[in-house]
Regions:
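Single conserved hydrophobic/aromatic residue that forms the stacking wall/gate
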Residues: 143-152
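Active-site beta->alpha loop and helix N-cap motifs at the rims of alpha/beta catalytic domains
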Residues: 2-12, 17-142
Length: 152
């Protein structure tokens, strides 16, 4: 059973940090992470919509998570959003997140096309299997998961 205590309190989404030329800024990411820690948050949700995950490359997403973990590991709860538009990259991000020691990985269903619940379940199960020692959180967004309300 998961230790749900680590998910209590304030766990804001981490905004993406860019340099003045529009490239992902590792230094600004580290500084923002430290700022949140100094403010007393209980954790961070890294790489979701606020982190502009859809617009970043897989390697940029890895670098951002590495920067966050360098500053925050062992200090606050880290949840890494790993959803991509293809299962292989999502699984790669899941394994990478686990290798860094995040507390949990999370994902919305694939976006763009509405998939049947069994296809979404397979997508999530594949990601969870890629990080078997890390807790998996289904990111429930009404826009992306309303079709999962059935009991199929």
């Amino acid at each position: 059973m998961a230790n749900l205590k680590k998910y209590e309190g304030i766990i804001p989404a981490l905004y993406a940090c860019y340099d003045d030329n529009g490239a992902v800024s590792i230094e600004r990411t580290k500084a923002l992470t430290q700022w949140f820690i100094d403010q007393g948050v209980n954790g961070l949700y890294v790489g979701g919509s606020s982190g502009e995950c859809i617009y970043q490359t897989k390697d940029e997403r890895k670098a951002v998570l590495e920067a966050v973990m360098e500053v925050a590991k062992g200090k606050i709860t880290i949840i890494a959003h790993i959803a991509c538009n293809n299962t292989a990259e999502s699984c790669e991000l899941a394994a990478h997140a686990e290798s860094l020691g995040v507390d949990a990985i999370a994902s919305i269903p694939p976006i763009y096309f509405k998939l049947p619940p069994y296809a979404i379940a397979k997508y999530w199960n594949d990601m969870s299997a890629a990080a078997p020692n890390t807790e998996f959180i289904i990111y429930r967004s009404e826009e992306h998961t309303s079709e999962l309300q059935s009991r199929e």
